């Protein structure tokens, strides 16, 4: 029984359509109806928009995020009508709900369209500081500086002033050209909180523009007050810029102590020590108090720099692995660099994998690569009998200018073809990918006729060799890609793809390849056209993990982290593609074996995807229970297995393998 027959025989599970809950009570129905009418008037009054010069602005694109945090874009007018206004109406009587909606609109440069919501919020919110700053911000962003000024002048007094209100008031004063008054208000904010980042910067920016000596004098006075760690930190930076490391270090140490070794001061101190090569001080005053749970990614990277200088590869690898559990994906390249660096140190120091004469090997398959790390689910394979012609698929060559993308495509394109040929055809083929030690091997030279003849001599029944060349053109993001079939009997070459792609259309090479193969072999299989490279370029790193040792995988945390993040994005942008979802589940299980620390951060989105039915297709619903096994959620795992009520022995045997570990 093949995957298709098995899925057809599974019981269909009816989906319950979620019903939208009704809004809050009808106590203020008449009032709310009038308010909604005002919002509709704002949305639909096109003549008013045209008079204000905002009509064409409706067709600019606005970014928004769905329930999974996936970014989408739509015309501003559509966003207003479909997203913003419905959200405002829903939260009209809920100030804690209305506040982030208005803030989000402000972040998108949307102001006049939320005027009624701002006024409503100001009238109803019980948080004085919050509503004052919101209305003041609205006036400021719409150019009504005088209105903002009057708002603060009339409502602020010694009894209700706060740090935030002082700063907001001062910012308006600056915009109105009243710099001396703004300076005093920023100072008032510092008297409330001497370590306020915004007030400190804006106050001293004004002072420094006026006179550098005055800046240093006032900084000195503030730094002498106990508890003013920000002033001490800034004064330390002044000393270091002047080359006075001793005085600078004195103030850094005190800033660290007074701040409780907080994240900001630890980052600044560690950066200064690394920049000035003060490694003993780094060890004594940073490393001794460093806590990756408390301190930020920048401090972690500085600690890794220190480990690199001191050749502490064990500590470096340990920190890379530990920090991979944090949501610092934007720093993945830097952490990957250190992982690779420390791994190479480990290999060299411990004489691991040091056979310099190791020859190339071949990973040979006609199965999708996720199969191997997913407990070999035979029932998920296409069990159709394979028939001639017999085809060998080779890794493509990467020639011309050195290119990371070209080398990736040289491996990823054959792997992508492999996955499609396996499920969509009965073609008898075999993919062979060369590797050396734990690295994929991509030839820098075209395959010769003699090489093709040698392959034929070793495979008497072989009909075709499918190969290709990816040439990165010099000094431009263009790629000349040739993919061909070599007829081993007639010793003739048939071109499948021969085209120059640029960075905007190179994604289409995968579509062109499938079309050409389908036409040549007269298989006429369905093609799911891709619109980007996101999915394609993940094949190469997945295979690289497959050929690596377990101990190496354990120290590839950041590569796994990036791969998992990308795979989730791929599923969310193509939610009807079951193969991409299977790849995600297989990757989650693979990660559990060597880097389980990565799973916790992604658990909410994985569970949410399951709740929203992304894994509820005929194919995926029998795999979804594995999610709960991966997260050690035995209650939900057993409940899902019982609900499926599948008695097929192949499936049950596979499921049991996850419990045997």
Q: Which sequence ranges carry the predicted segments?
A:
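Register position in tetratricopeptide repeats
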Residues: 107, 141-142, 175-176, 208-210, ...
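Short beta-strand->alpha-helix linker/helix-N-cap micro-motif
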Residues: 386-459, 463-475, 494
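Catalytic-center loop of serine/cysteine hydrolases
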Residues: 440-546
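TPR-adjacent "capping" and linker segments in tetratricopeptide-repeat scaffold/adaptor proteins
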Residues: 80-97, 121-125, 220-225, 381-386, ...
């Amino acid at each position: 029984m093949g995957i298709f027959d098995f899925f057809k025989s599974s019981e269909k599970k009816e989906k319950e359509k979620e019903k939208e809950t009704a809004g809050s009570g009808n106590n203020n129905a008449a009032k709310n109806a009038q308010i909604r009418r005002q919002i509709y008037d704002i949305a639909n009054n096109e003549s008013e928009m045209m008079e204000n010069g905002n009509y064409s602005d409706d067709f600019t694109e606005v970014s928004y995020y769905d329930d999974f945090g996936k970014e989408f874009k739509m015309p501003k007018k559509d966003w207003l009508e479909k997203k913003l206004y419905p959200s405002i109406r829903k939260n009209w009587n809920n100030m804690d709900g209305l506040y982030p909606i208005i803030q989000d609109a402000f972040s998108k440069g949307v102001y006049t369209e939320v005027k009624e919501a701002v006024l409503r919020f100001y009238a109803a919110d019980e948080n004085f500081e919050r509503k004052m700053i919101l209305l003041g911000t609205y006036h400021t962003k719409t150019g009504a500086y005088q209105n903002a000024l009057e708002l603060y002048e009339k409502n602020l007094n010694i009894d209700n002033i706060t740090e935030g209100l002082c700063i907001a008031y001062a910012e308006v004063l600056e915009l109105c050209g009243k710099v001396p008054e703004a300076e005093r208000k920023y100072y008032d904010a510092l008297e409330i909180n001497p370590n306020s980042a915004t007030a400190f910067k804006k106050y001293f920016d004004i002072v420094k523009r006026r006179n550098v000596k005055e800046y240093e004098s006032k900084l000195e006075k503030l730094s002498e007050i106990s508890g003013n760690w920000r002033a001490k930190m800034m004064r330390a930076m002044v000393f270091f810029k002047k080359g006075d490391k001793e005085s600078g270090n004195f103030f850094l140490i005190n800033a660290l102590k007074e701040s409780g070794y907080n994240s900001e001061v630890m980052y600044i101190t560690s950066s200064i020590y690394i920049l000035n090569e003060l490694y003993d001080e780094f060890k004594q005053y940073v490393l001794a108090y460093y806590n990756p749970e408390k301190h930020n990614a920048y401090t972690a990277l500085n600690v890794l720099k220190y480990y690199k200088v001191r050749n502490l590869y064990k500590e470096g690898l340990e920190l890379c692995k530990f920090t991979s559990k944090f949501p610092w994906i934007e720093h993945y390249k830097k952490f990957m660099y250190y992982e690779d660096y420390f791994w190479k140190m480990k290999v060299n120091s411990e004489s691991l994998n040091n056979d310099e004469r190791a020859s190339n090997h071949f990973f040979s398959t006609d199965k999708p690569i996720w199969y191997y790390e997913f407990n070999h689910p035979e029932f998920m394979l296409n069990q159709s009998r394979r028939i001639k012609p017999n085809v060998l698929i080779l890794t493509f060559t990467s020639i011309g200018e050195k290119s990371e993308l070209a080398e990736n495509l040289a491996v990823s394109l054959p792997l992508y073809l492999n996955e499609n040929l396996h499920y969509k055809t009965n073609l008898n083929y075999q993919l062979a990918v060369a590797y050396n030690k734990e690295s994929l091997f991509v030839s820098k030279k075209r395959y010769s006729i003699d090489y093709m003849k040698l392959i034929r001599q070793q495979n008497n029944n072989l009909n075709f060799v499918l190969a290709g060349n990816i040439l990165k053109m010099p000094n431009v993001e263009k790629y000349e890609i040739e993919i061909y079939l070599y007829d081993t009997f007639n010793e003739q070459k048939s071109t499948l793809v021969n085209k120059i792609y640029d960075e905007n259309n190179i994604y289409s090479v995968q579509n062109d390849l499938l079309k050409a193969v389908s036409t040549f072999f007269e298989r006429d299989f369905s093609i799911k056209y891709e619109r980007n490279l996101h999915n394609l370029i993940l094949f190469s790193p997945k295979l690289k993990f497959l050929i690596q040792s377990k101990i190496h995988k354990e120290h590839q945390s950041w590569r796994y982290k990036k791969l998992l993040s990308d795979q989730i994005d791929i599923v969310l942008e193509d939610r009807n593609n079951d193969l991409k979802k299977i790849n995600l589940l297989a990757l989650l299980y693979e990660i559990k074996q060597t880097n389980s620390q990565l799973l916790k951060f992604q658990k909410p989105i994985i569970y949410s995807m399951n709740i929203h039915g992304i894994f509820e297709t005929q194919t995926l619903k029998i795999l979804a229970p594995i999610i709960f096994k991966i997260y050690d959620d035995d209650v939900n795992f057993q409940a899902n297995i019982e609900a499926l009520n599948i008695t097929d022995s192949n499936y049950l045997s596979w499921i049991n393998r996850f419990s045997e570990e």
